Amino acid sequence: MTLGDTLFTLVTFLVLMLAVGKVAWKPVSKMMADRQQKISGDLDYAEKSRKDADALAAKRQEELQHSQADAVKIVNQAKENGEKQRQSLVDAANAEVTTMKKNAQTDIDQARKDALASAKNDVADLSLTIAQKLIGKELNADDQKGLIDDYIKRLGDANGSH
């Protein structure tokens, strides 16, 4: 290669470089800069999305823990309410049993009094009849009452000694 050829090649190369620099370099550089900005924006968006996802996951985990605590609280409250209801039912049943016992005892006492009064009247009638037959006369009310009271007292003493 001669000096003229080398010089021609060098000048052609420089002219071509200037033409490429003026025509193609700016669009290629702009395209590369735009691509770099897009990649940087995508990376920033991906990082933001990852942080948002982490924050959302943490929030969901916290809500899950709160809901579990609420569920435990609800279960414990239900147990307490159930125990209170059970105790209330037991107390009501015990009160009813106590009332029934008192009523039964009252009924027993009344029946005993009625039986004693009936027996007293029967004994009085029987005593009066026997006394009339033995004595042969009618007793007045005071005599009759005295005989009946005496008989009942002896009857009570006899029953009490057994």
UniProtKB/Swiss-Prot annotation:
Similarity section: Belongs to the ATPase B chain family.
The record's Gene Ontology cellular component field reads: plasma membrane; proton-transporting ATP synthase complex
Residues that span the membrane, as ranges: 6-25
Q: What is this protein called?
A: ATP synthase subunit b
Function as written in the Swiss-Prot or TrEMBL entry: F(1)F(0) ATP synthase produces ATP from ADP in the presence of a proton or sodium gradient. F-type ATPases consist of two structural domains, F(1) containing the extramembraneous catalytic core and F(0) containing the membrane proton channel, linked together by a central stalk and a peripheral stalk. During catalysis, ATP synthesis in the catalytic domain of F(1) is coupled via a rotary mechanism of the central stalk subunits to proton translocation. Component of the F(0) channel, it forms part of the peripheral stalk, linking F(1) to F(0).
Q: Provide the gene name from the record.
A: atpF
Q: What is the lineage of its organism?
A: Bacteria, Bacillati, Bacillota, Bacilli, Lactobacillales
Q: Which UniProt keywords apply?
A: ATP synthesis, Cell membrane, CF(0), Hydrogen ion transport, Ion transport, Membrane, Transmembrane, Transmembrane helix, Transport
- Chief place of localization: membrane
Location in or out of the cell: Cell membrane
A Pfam family this protein belongs to? ATP-synt_B
Q: Which NCBIfam families match?
A: ATP_synt_b (TIGR01144)
Q: Which GO terms describe its molecular function?
A: proton-transporting ATP synthase activity, rotational mechanism; proton-transporting ATPase activity, rotational mechanism
Q: How does it sit in the membrane?
A: Single-pass membrane protein
Quaternary structure annotation from Swiss-Prot or TrEMBL: F-type ATPases have 2 components, F(1) - the catalytic core - and F(0) - the membrane proton channel. F(1) has five subunits: alpha(3), beta(3), gamma(1), delta(1), epsilon(1). F(0) has three main subunits: a(1), b(2) and c(10-14). The alpha and beta chains form an alternating ring which encloses part of the gamma chain. F(1) is attached to F(0) by a central stalk formed by the gamma and epsilon chains, while a peripheral stalk is formed by the delta and b chains.
